[in-house]
Amino acid sequence: YAAAEKPLSVDDIQLGLVEISQRSGAPAAKEAADGDTGMPALRTRRTDLHGRTPNQVAYLRDITTHDITFGIGPAGTGKTYLAVACAVDALERDAVKRIVLVRPAVEAGERLGFLPGDLAQKVDPYLRPLYDALYDLMGFDKVAKLFERTTIEVAPLAYMRGRTLNHSFIILD
């Protein structure tokens, strides 16, 4: 805890950035340029799914090789879509028993009570990007069946405290 109280210096940050770029950026850039990412094909309805940029290649590799992966980037870079694709792949391979999609149910300064309807109707607009990715990767009918069986679950972040999430692929978007 003592180290947490000490502020980071500019040199520490620079060294960290250099180390990160040497570890993940350079190999991913070469692989993406060659068109060979070394990634096995993801099992989804889309057969052409792969990382299109060096960062996407590194992101997919990190998701498939680590238990926890953080994806940070601007809107439209594929963070949610690629994470959902990896979750669908893990479910199809029986590596996980369910997919739990979590998203904050409100925008900054809003409250759920302001929207009409029950909880599902209130959070639905905020979860639309996750639904869109699922429908594209699995098809509407299959997604509907998996929702009925609670193999795929969508939950607001506020309701996740105290949950047991064994054998689950969790995407916090």
Where are these regions (language model features)?
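Conserved adenine-nucleotide phosphate-binding loops and their immediately adjacent elements
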Residues: 36-48
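Interdomain "pre-motor" coupling segment immediately N-terminal to P-loop NTPase/helicase cores
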Residues: 1-36
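Hydrophobic anchor at the beta1->P-loop junction of P-loop NTPases
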Residues: 71-73
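Conserved P-loop
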Residues: 81-150
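Conserved RecA-like ASCE ATPase "motif II neighborhood" in helicase/translocase motors
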Residues: 150-171
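Conserved glycine(s) of the Walker
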Residues: 78
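Pre-Walker A adenine-sensing motif
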Residues: 50-64
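Walker A (P-loop) ATP-phosphate-binding motif of ABC ATPase nucleotide-binding domains
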Residues: 68
